[in-house]
Amino acid sequence: GGGGDRSLGVEYKPVLRPGEAVSVLVAWGDVVLAATGTLTAVSTDGRFLAFAHPFTNRGAVAFPLARSWIHQVVPSLDTPFKIGTPTSIVGIVTQDRPQAIGGFIGRFAPVMDISLNFRDVDSGTETFKRFKTASDPFMMTKVIPEMITGLVDNVWGRVGEGSAKLTLKIEGGRLAEG
């Protein structure tokens, strides 16, 4: 089960307008993690500002930007937020500052493809899961392990204690041997 193509499409010549919903993508596919907000401004050369607040506040970054569909706005005097679904990749977030996120529409961030094959030795079932993620050093060390753990819990489908044997194989170009 799983592993169906839930990847987002890419709009190579998108037209976005201030007020539209956009998301910063961390992961998409069988795992979705994104921050959704409002597009504030777009210049004629494709530069944009959005959110009017930071995402991670880490300065120079490279996250995909997606167009989003808003399901619900949760009002709050302290921290209002939107519940949305990314629908297509439209650009790259290159700056994550205290005042806003910014970047370019029609340019795209590098991403990693993560594929996981789970085999339950008790039942003999196999499950394939796949997602893409921003190629970001922080996300690689902090967020991706949590996503994989969540998939293990989800696929395992059991409640309570237990044991699992995990084998991890990392493949990719220009990886150091060792």
Tell me the role of every PLM-derived stretch.
Residues 1-178:
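Terminal presequence/propeptide segments associated with secretion/organelle targeting
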